[in-house]
Amino acid sequence: MALLQIAEPGQSAAPHQHRLAVGIDLGTTNSLVAAVRSGVANTLPDDKSHHSLPSVVRYTQEGVEVGVDAEANSAKDPQNTIISVKRFMGRSLSDIRSGVQDLPYQLETSENGLPVFVTEQGKVNPIQVSAEILKPLVSRAEKTLGGELEGVVITVPAYFDDAQRQGTKDAAGLLGVKVLRLLNEPTAAAIAYGLDSGQEGVIAIYDLGGGTFDISILRLHKGVFEVLATGGDSALGGDDFDHLLYQHLLNQWQLASPSATLSRRLLIESRRVKEALTDNIQVTASIKLDDGTELTHDVAKATFDDLISSLVKKTVSSCRRALRDAGVTNDEVLETVMVGGSTRVPLVRELVDKFFGKEPLTSIDPDRVVAIGAAIQADILVGNKPESDLLLLDVLPLSLGIETMGGLVEKIVSRNTTIPVAKAQEFTTFKDGQTAMAFHVVQGERELVDDCRSLARFTLKGIPPLAAGAAHIRVTFQVDADGLLSVTAMEKSTGVQSSIQVKPSFGLTDEEIGTMLKDSMANAKEDITRRMLAEQKVEAARVLETLSAALQKDAVLLTESERSDIEQAMASLAQISSQDDADAIEKAIEALDASTQDFAAKRMDNSIKLALKGQSVDSI
């Protein structure tokens, strides 16, 4: 008897893949789960036909509410209802409070500086809250697909740093879910649009979600998906539009100190007005006060545009920087892909269209496009598409390196390097008999450690006690596909090694994300001057250290006059190197070198004499 092939309308009759994997867009405002079924990628609805799950979690004495129910009760119970938790991921409490005012939560700081929400269910951190959002998405997928998932691909903003990425993986880990990969949201969007299928050239992905903004410049060439440059802001999104409108309404209604409940209702109303202004030139905002009084105010589209104009222009400035970093011009960009619900705002589309000089792609629902791309990638990673030649090459947004003598930065992996990547460099000891070496891993573009971001410190012990410069320590930086860094230091002769996986206690602050690159360009000339000075000071210290050891060992080879001349030159170098004149230090080193030429020759002669002592010509 022949088997009937049954497929859903509009889909192929190919049987469902036996390896179950999904893509999850863990968003600031809403989250979605998508899968490839019968060869077609699409988001999966819940039993009420809702595709998106509000990223809202409410903690009560009875239990935990997630999604629509939590959102519905958020106005009456704001202290126990966590919204936009993605903005808290991997960031310090002080950083969060400096960026967003009027938070209704009772917050505490954990031992490592991370925020903790105090709720009726007890204390929870952003990772645990994120896990609660992931839980119904995973459950929905397994119920719909009819089996246990082999893994998930979770999308993150390209600008997420190590702490934020690790927090996202840890949230999935709390559920026992295997993370196949963290995928940058803009890259996922490009996959969803099928821009890898035959098209070649430069693509811009403009991703403005609820809490984050990313711009990625991609080059597509013969199946290779390379990210040329990334930029953005991990604390700029539609939520900020809501807060600006919220502040505007507070001012119009002269509400100086609204209660937490009223504040939440007003924020919800601000979001409704924002969304309604997408298709209307004027919308009436209304709110009922705690005493029952109802207030109304007409908000014109022009007024809303004025409120958000500076933020939208800020995203365009990021686009300009990303193009410069990628080494391409506006004219070279073939397509501009719009991602994220906030790209529905007319002013956003208008300014992006104007900047790139072409109408952006919006045919796929901007709220679903990222999850769909993640599903396609998950399908590939579990082996359901072995014929796929899609290759994703993400890049590092900031350089990684280590501190060297004098507080200098030696960059090991440069900014915009394609990942995954492994790079190594050899270093040596500074002092005779040195048996340990401390490593300080830093991130940034500046020349001095003080101007970069500290990531981690570790120590390599067990180095053979050799002369300065004789030991060889190989330092290897490895960055995996998720952008997580591990650093290993190994002494080559013994094989002794030490390593560390970098998981910063919290992420970059808003100011750091926006200014690190600008600072490096603005201070480039001054940084080089400071580096040259530091290098001369390190060299002076090395020369003095080496010469002091030589005098202690072989001073008998010198006359009193010769020794006095050398010591005077050493004192002069020591005095000059305490000042900030690189040229003077260099000249003092040269003067000391000239005064020690005869001493060096005498030491060489003496070493040869000692080596030949007691040996015959025949034995030599």
Swiss-Prot record:
Coiled coil residues, start to end:
none
UniProt keywords (A-Z) are:
ATP-binding, Chaperone, Nucleotide-binding
Q: Which GO terms describe its biological process?
A: iron-sulfur cluster assembly
Q: Which terms does the record give in the GO molecular function aspect? A: ATP binding; ATP hydrolysis activity; ATP-dependent protein folding chaperone; unfolded protein binding
Q: Which NCBIfam families match?
A: HscA (TIGR01991), PRK05183.1 (NF003520)
Family that this chain belongs to: Belongs to the heat shock protein 70 family.
Role description: Chaperone involved in the maturation of iron-sulfur cluster-containing proteins. Has a low intrinsic ATPase activity which is markedly stimulated by HscB.
State what protein this is by name: Chaperone protein HscA homolog
Q: What is the lineage of its organism?
A: Bacteria, Pseudomonadati, Pseudomonadota, Gammaproteobacteria, Alteromonadales
